Amino acid sequence: MLTDNKPVGCRSVVAFLLSCIFLTGFIGLSSANAAEYSYQGTEPCSSIQQLSFDSTAANASITWQTDLGPRLPGSNASAELRNSITENLTAFNFEESSHFRENFTLTNLIGTYSPKNSTGQNVVFVAHYDSRYIAERDYNESKRNQPIDGANDGASGVAVLIELGKIIPNLQLNHDVTLFFTDAEDQGITGGFHPLTWSYGAYAWVENLTEDYKDNISAYIVIDMIGDAYLDFTKIKDTSAELWETVTPIAAALGMMESELDCEGNYGRAIYDPTKTRGVIDDHVPANNAGIPAINFIDINYGENASTFGGHWHTHNDTADKVSAESLGYIGDLLELGLITSAWILVPTDSNDNANTVDQDESVLLQHDNAVEDVEKNRFVGYISIILVSIILVLILIADISLKL
């Protein structure tokens, strides 16, 4: 129990001052670490004439890939596909990452294009390049244990990323772009619920990322099973709502939404429906779980009038003739237009006005620099406050010792 009223009053005042200083310090540090950012892409119709994605070449790539044979983890076909990708996309810095899982070794292929004026932000495009090791849904029971071609489920996403990679160096971007070809996405166990046996490659990649690398990923965009001649896709559960908001104006501009006008003033086709949400276990899950903003363009109704996860999915009918160059073109244009309009790049929300008064590239760089400057100022205030608190604590300790003496 305290018996001296004067020290009690003094300490109360000191405690109040300490609380104020601590609050100031933590607000400063909190502001430094919690700057608000948002996606603010430019109007897409003004850039639509710049699109150069080659859907015919993408379609030809699917035939070439399936002719390699099943792209199972550790197979010669997989190695040949990876070699072809690296040889054709020389502007990207590629690396392979191998991981042992159960009874096989998977190999991820990661390529990054980083322009000289890069702000450091990174848009990651993801497609699995492995094909399914069994055809468990095939009507012919005698063939269910045989691997499938995987023209749509595997080759279609790879084909789009390859052709996108060819044109990315010409888009005059000011941020990094990573093409992530995942292995062992489609080697999951059927029967029962075994979610962790799917997307092995994506899980392995995310688990080995540094915090700095994750923080620089502004968008992680998966494309899977997007070659169906009867293409349709929706939002996907466990993804970034903010990223989906960027998709709607781009898809509408390209004529992919029947309820919206395209750039020519016509209503589009029923390809993308943002009013619906489907659930699927795929390569977006590990990224989303790690706090990385992720979305997934995936058509889970493969074939004309196909039901969900029905039609040609995981059957021997998943062949190159079921894939459409037009569908590949829609997705390729969607990704390219998103890059051109900076739809998937984060900018500070309090710098919106600046973006309308300067050139787009210069604006992003200026906003980035201003944000860094504000962060450093807030951190400085926080650190000074904490130093003052430390000094006062020492003075209190000295005062207490003096009183006791």
Regions found by a protein language model. Give the residues of each.
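Secretory targeting signatures
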Residues: 1-40, 351-358, 362-405
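N-terminal capping segment at the start of a domain
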Residues: 35-82, 305-322
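A non-catalytic alpha/beta surface segment that caps or lines the substrate-entry region
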Residues: 47, 60-118, 268
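Catalytic-core environment of secreted peptidases
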Residues: 55-61, 66-67, 92, 107-182, ...
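Extracytoplasmic/secreted proteins, especially bacterial periplasmic and envelope-associated proteins
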Residues: 57-67, 76-88, 93, 156-163, ...
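Solvent-exposed loop/turn segments at secondary-structure junctions
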Residues: 71-73, 100-104, 116-118, 129-133, ...
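Acidic/histidine-rich catalytic neighborhood of metal-dependent amide-processing enzymes
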Residues: 146-250
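Active-site-adjacent substrate-binding region
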Residues: 226-350, 358-359, 366-367
